[in-house]
A protein has these predicted regions:
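Covalent nucleotidyltransferase core used to form phosphodiester bonds in nucleic acids
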Residues: 26-28, 62-75
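Short, well-ordered strand-loop elements centered on a beta-strand within folded domains, enriched
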Residues: 64, 159-160
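Short, structured beta-strand-loop surface elements
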Residues: 68-150, 155-158
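Extreme N-terminal tail/first-helix region
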Residues: 1-28
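A short helix-loop-beta-strand connector motif used in the catalytic cores of GNAT acetyltransferases and
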Residues: 31-35, 146-147
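A generic local structural motif
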Residues: 23-24, 50-51, 136-138
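Short beta-strand segments
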Residues: 33-68
Length: 160
């Protein structure tokens, strides 16, 4: 049996237009659902880079998902292993640990699926569909092959 490759993840065309607006609103402390700003040092430039991300918070634990695959922020976070999460007016340095493919699939199936399913009016599934990420719910193992997940914990790895 030949393993089927995961489809490449691409951001929908609206994302380059939406992200600057989202960043402005989030920087002003406006909450936009489960969104936050992630600031992480560029792996080549060394400069801080900031992008809006979906932040999943459940039972005292936090995760962010590379919905569009191996993007620049994902590669930067892998290299730095730490960043700054800003939610409203609260900024926090966090350590980021990328989940293995198996753990990411388990996260999608047992944590994210009920989380998304609990959103009113089917909003979670609608948003995932608009982002081209419905496979996170429909086929977690396949999604985990090309949608990285990072668990965030307080503090910096250098300070431990």
């Amino acid at each position: 049996m030949i393993a089927q490759a995961a489809p490449p993840s691409r951001a929908p065309r609206l994302i380059p237009f939406f992200n600057p607006l989202a960043m402005r609103l989030l920087r002003r402390g406006r909450l936009m659902g489960p969104n936050a700003l992630l600031s992480v040092r560029g792996r080549k430039s060394g400069e801080m880079r900031t992008t809006p991300v979906a932040l999943v918070e459940l039972d005292g634990r936090r995760w962010i998902i590379g919905t569009f695959g191996d993007t620049n922020w994902v590669r930067n976070l892998r290299a730095a292993a730490e960043g700054i999460i800003t939610v409203g007016n609260r900024r926090e340095t966090v350590q980021a640990l990328e989940l293995s493919r198996e753990d990411a699939a388990g996260f999608f199936a047992t944590t994210l699926k009920p989380y998304v399913g609990g959103m009113p009016l089917g909003l979670g599934r609608l948003i995932l569909g608009m982002l081209g990420a419905r496979d996170i719910i429909d086929d977690p193992a396949r999604a985990a092959a090309h949608r990285p997940v990072f668990e965030l914990t307080p503090g910096s790895p250098r300070s431990r």
